[in-house]
A protein has these predicted regions:
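Vicinal oxygen chelate
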Residues: 1-14, 24-25, 31-126, 134-144
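Short, surface-exposed ligand-recognition loops at beta-strand->loop->(often short) alpha-helix junctions
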Residues: 16-19
Length: 144
């Protein structure tokens, strides 16, 4: 099976937030995402949103008790842990780290140069989702 050709990433993380409007604002301010699309239901809750970063994207929406939502736990429901982490490649990791820290990101793995190349750090957003940002580009051929 081959992926459908497209202009962006073929793998797009999807997250749920209790307050998706606040999450969108914070993710744009702290991490530099831009709104690609935000769709609300009849009560003004975020049904589906797309936030872009470079040629990548995350999708998000409000926590819901539907067939899909019943398979997703929020970090605070499972002791602050995650089973997955969104990894984002950034051009200037040090300045991205400083921006995220200034916006209140909870740093869980401090900024550091990595032995395998590049630099990176990990943090939690206000609802506890784990993120990794780094300058290492896994698509680049290995130097050797």
């Amino acid at each position: 099976m081959n992926p459908t050709p497209q202009s962006g990433s073929t793998i797009i993380p999807c997250l749920r937030y209790r307050d998706a409007h606040a999450a969108i604002e914070w993710l744009c301010k702290a991490f530099g995402f831009t709104r690609h699309a935000v769709h609300e239901d009849g009560q003004g809750r975020v049904e589906h949103a797309q936030l872009a970063y470079g040629n990548g994207m995350v999708m998000l929406g409000e926590v819901r008790d539907n067939a899909f939502g019943q398979h997703i736990a929020q970090p605070d429901e499972i002791g602050g842990r995650e089973t997955q982490c969104a990894c984002v490649t950034v051009a200037n990791c040090k300045s991205h780290y400083e921006q995220a820290k200034a916006a209140g990101a909870v740093i869980v793995d401090d900024y550091a140069e990595k032995e395998y190349g590049g630099a990176g750090y990990s943090c939690h957003d206000p609802e506890g989702h784990l993120w990794y940002f780094g300058s290492y580009d896994p698509w680049q051929p290995e130097q050797g």
